[in-house]
Amino acid sequence: MQEYKKNRVSKVAFAYCMALLFMIIFISSTFFLTSKRHIPNTEKDQYALALRGSIITKDNFTITSSRQIYRAEIDLRSINKDKFDLFLKLFQIYSGISNDQVADIKKRMQNQKKRSYNFVLLQNLDSKQASYLKDLAKKLYIQGFFKAFTNNSGRVETRGLNIIEHEEDRIYMSKDSFTPIIGYTKMILDPESGILKNIGVKGLEKYYDECLSPVQNEKIQGLKDIGGNIILNLNSLQQKKINGCDLYLNLSLKLQKSIEKAIDQRNEDLKANEIIVGVMESKTGRILALASSRRYDPQNRGKDLSVLNASAIEYGYEAGSVIKPFIFTTALRLGKIKMDEVINTYGGSYKLGRFTIKDDHKMDKMTMEEVIRYSSNIGMIQIAKRLNNIEIVSGLKIFKFGEKSGIDLPYEQKGEIPNPKRLRDIEKSVLSYGYGLKTTFMQLLAAYNVFNNDGFYITPRLAEKFYQNGRFTNLDDDVKKEKILSSEAAKTMQNVLINVIEKGTGKKAITQGIIAGGKTGTARIAERQGYTSNRYNASFFGFANDLNHAYTIGVLVRHPTKPYSYYAAQSALPMFKDVVDILINEEFLTPIQDNNQTSTNN
């Protein structure tokens, strides 16, 4: 009986102990499940910013591209202080930094706030440095160099050395060349990756921003291994990087640089506010060079914001006598004048309202061809009298004055032409020799091209094609070609302009073996108070051909300050001759060997 009682007590005690044990386990489990657990963070996201596309010249020089910029940082909680000197020594070896840079890191670390753990070791690392440092970080991680710590979220992690892509650097290898037309970019924060990327602000960078901009960033998401690398398996997310397009230009680097050099040399003498030169392939509208003396480094822009503007399309001005051929052509096309006709030029002096108009070549009479050859304002007034207001303004509209040329640049101005309903006789007279309207350099270049392109107006084009996803796409679909002048009228005007150089005001541009024609223009600059007596713009627009090639060339010299250089024959015309010589030297033109020079644009 006594034995039975002992067994029963033992069983009850055992049952009680087991119940107590289960209760302890239950309570402990509940506490463990409901409390914060310091579990190592095993997930990782990794981004790589897709890059903006490159810009490449006709002669296959990359003039603009992008690169990735990285920074190296460390969480100070991941490293023991007694190991930091060793770490810095390894960091210096792998990054290639100097002793001074190491000293700077130590100094900044001493000044680091106590509760600020994230420390940037080095910024502006290139891809090569970043690759070496990533290798170092991996080795140190595997060897247990870094210690684990509990972060603010209660998770245990070992951050160690992190190499982070933080910026896309836009590089302009050609420095100030091709500016201002190439434009520039500014940096904004990419919301997905948190990396600074570039967007176009001016020039080609702006116009083709959608094409040049990256399509898709690289993204890898998944579990990480002991070395901090993402484990690639069926559960990981991988998004491919798609960079922006590479833009191929019609512009030639060699030709552009040669013309820019010639412009700079001329402007040392002329002291002009700006010199602009454009060269267009007449039959295709391709711009082979578009140069300015007002250039800048896109990576180090100054405070003068006006330099950033592309004056070739954004500066509207009264062009003077270079407008005469278009009024002349309008009268010829409408049958208001005949080429064999002689017109009264009043001995080179003519009363227009309260003003007296004088010609440089004082003649009682001139043939129609001589009116252009000698740039007679009086002759043009007589021609304008035969046109009514609608005819003269419509004639300008045919050549696309008053509308954008369509060139692939942003912020193009369309200029101003007068309202025919409000055009008085005196205003119509001065319009005939280039006052009372505003035009741009590019409008004039495209309009003069008609005379050298069998009467066809064609859209000027800086870019030829772009490359993306393994294939080229031509941009020819954006080029408009329109017959606006009969072949006969275009041929007549071409010959008239050839005579300007061979027999008239453009003799300084004569080049042996080259068929060249064009027109000078000198115009006072209008200000709020009226026309100034000492500020002028000088222009020359024309063409230069050989047996197989035809180019339309424009020169604008804005406000030259050298005495008497405001005359186009003393400033713009010699610059035109420089360009023709460059085209020959660079083998764009080949002088004709025999003396039977005939036009090549039939």
What label would you give each PLM region?
Residues 1-300, 390-400, 509-512, 528-531, ...:
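Periplasmic/cell-envelope proteins involved in peptidoglycan metabolism and beta-lactam response
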Residues 62-64, 224-238, 275-321, 326-561, ...:
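Beta-lactam-recognizing serine transpeptidase/beta-lactamase-like catalytic domain environment
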